[in-house]
């Protein structure tokens, strides 16, 4: 008889109604039969938590540096093969680069082959291409290598044999 004293639970055809206080209550249709269970509690319906707004100080915005960026740098690009002679760099944070251009699969193989010369460059990009440029062919990819100095770049170009199907462009990049 102790089992019969358990609280009743509604049948599987029970309906869920939301009261104006924001709690969910179970209601039973008139033609359903009750089942025994102890889960007749009201379930609170609360909205999911919102993300907190980020708080920034008035001095610094997101993704900004504490040092102001200025154009007081008097360094100029001075590469003999560069067509933009005397171009002023806006930041002292530039690094020498080489763009290798060619068929994407050839560039991928070249990038794998130069892994034994890791000490002669800093970073190598994946194969990429310019989008939305009229007059370019689809089979023209680019791999970019960065160097710590112009001397390191020159040592790389002297040491590594570059296939004739790959063209290269020297330059600098702001990082």
UniProtKB/Swiss-Prot annotation:
Q: Which residues form a coiled coil?
A: none
Q: Which UniProt keywords apply?
A: Host nucleus
Q: What is its main location?
A: host cell
Q: Which GO terms describe its molecular function?
A: DNA binding; DNA-binding transcription factor activity
Q: Where in the cell is it found?
A: Host nucleus
Compositional bias per record (Polar residues), positions renumbered to this chain: 17-41, 57-67, 83-94
Q: Composition bias, kind Basic and acidic residues: at what positions?
A: 72-82
Would you tell me the Gene Ontology cellular component terms?
host cell nucleus
Residue stretches spanning the membrane: none
Tell me which Pfam families the record gives.
PPV_E2_C
Region Disordered, residue ranges: 15-98
Give the domain of life. Answer: Viruses
UniProt key word Glycoprotein: no
GO terms, biological process: regulation of DNA replication
Family under the similarity heading: Belongs to the papillomaviridae E8^E2C protein family.
Q: Report the protein's function.
A: Plays a role in limiting the replication of viral DNA in keratinocytes. Recruits the host NCoR/SMRT complex to viral replication foci to mediate repression of both viral replication and transcription.
Protein name, please?
Protein E8^E2C
């Amino acid at each position: 008889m102790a089992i019969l004293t358990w609280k009743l639970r509604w049948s599987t055809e029970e309906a869920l109604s939301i009261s104006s206080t924001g709690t969910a209550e179970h209601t039973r249709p008139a033609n359903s039969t009750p089942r025994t269970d102890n889960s007749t509690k009201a379930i609170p319906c609360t909205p999911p938590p919102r993300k907190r707004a980020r708080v920034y100080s008035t001095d610094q915005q997101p993704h900004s540096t504490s040092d102001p960026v200025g154009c007081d740098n008097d360094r100029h690009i001075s590469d003999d093969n560069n067509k933009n002679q005397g171009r002023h760099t806006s930041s002292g944070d530039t690094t020498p680069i080489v763009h290798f251009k060619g068929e994407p699969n050839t560039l991928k193989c070249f990038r794998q082959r130069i892994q034994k010369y890791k000490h002669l460059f800093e970073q190598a990009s994946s194969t990429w291409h310019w989008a939305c440029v009229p007059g370019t062919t689809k089979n023209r990819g680019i791999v970019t290598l960065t160097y710590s100095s112009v001397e390191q770049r020159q040592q790389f170009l002297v040491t590594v044999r570059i296939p004739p199907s790959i063209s290269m462009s020297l330059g600098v990049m702001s990082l």
